[in-house]
Amino acid sequence: MAGMKEIRGKIKSVQNTRKITKAMEMVAASKMRRAQERMRAARPYADKVRAIAAHMSRANPEYRHPFMVANDGAQTAGIILVTTDKGLCGGLNTNVLRATVQKFKELEEKGQKVEATAIGGKGLGFLNRFGAKVMSQVVHLGDTPHLDKLIGAVKTQLDLYSEGKLSAVYIAYTRFVNTMKQEAVIEQLLPLSSDHFEADDGTPATSWDYIYEPDAQAVVDELLVRYVEALVYQAVAENMASEQSARMVAMKAASDNAKTVISELQLVYNKSRQAAITKELSEIVGGAAAV
């Protein structure tokens, strides 16, 4: 009977755990919908700003902002690492951290040092354990990204690039593909890249420049600030949508596994109970026969 009591305790414990994971699954599903709405609302703007910046990188404008000039003499690169503040989201953070480590190695093989900005507590903890130099950080963002909280930490890297102290600035985050799939990506933020310089049909587009009014410097200075803000905000929005999707899937898997464990324990309990009853009946029958 002691074994049966222990099994009942295990069943109760797993049932309580399943209630928690089921509740977390439902909360994550609700947050996921809101995060996806924010991400999808911001994505067209970010894509258009990225395309404009790509055109500018291929053109020969009358004014060239520091963000458009490659700092070939700099021996240090910057990486903005976007992760979550919380765990329980499957391999989401692991994948982007693995990609970041690979980027660190690639840059170091080229003789470049790396300085990082951490957005999210998980990334900050990893960078500290990894021994990377963290120049700025943002944690506890909550469920809604706010640009005013983000841009201060990112501006540290932008200022260093403008001063010619960084050779490039990259941003690492998890891009949302769909509810079941998210992918870790690392994009070059600075100098302006022409990677997205394509026509609508995917073929290389023709290079051309814009007409700037009232003057090129005023427009370009403002535009490139918006470019950085848009890409950083979009990266965080994509990462948050990916986080809630991954957490919902992970908690659903945990709930399903808990249900399986409960069924298996219930079967073991029933077998133990049946064996105990059979033993008692055998003892009663044996006693009656002896009398």
Curated annotation (Swiss-Prot):
InterPro entries: ATP_synth_F1_ATPase_gsu (IPR035968), ATP_synth_F1_gsu (IPR000131), ATP_synth_F1_gsu_CS (IPR023632). Keywords: ATP synthesis, Cell inner membrane, Cell membrane, CF(1), Hydrogen ion transport, Ion transport, Membrane, Transport. F-type ATPases have 2 components, CF(1) - the catalytic core - and CF(0) - the membrane proton channel. CF(1) has five subunits: alpha(3), beta(3), gamma(1), delta(1), epsilon(1). CF(0) has three main subunits: a, b and c. Belongs to the ATPase gamma chain family. GO terms for molecular function: ATP binding; proton-transporting ATP synthase activity, rotational mechanism. The keyword Ribosomal protein does not apply. PROSITE patterns: ATPASE_GAMMA. It comes from the Bacteria. GO terms for biological process: proton motive force-driven plasma membrane ATP synthesis. GO terms for cellular component: plasma membrane; proton-transporting ATP synthase complex. Gene3D superfamilies: 3.40.1380.10, ATP synthase, gamma subunit, helix hairpin domain (1.10.287.80). It is a peripheral membrane protein. Its main location: membrane. Pfam families: ATP-synt. It is found in: Cell inner membrane. This is ATP synthase gamma chain. Produces ATP from ADP in the presence of a proton gradient across the membrane. The gamma chain is believed to be important in regulating ATPase activity and the flow of protons through the CF(0) complex.
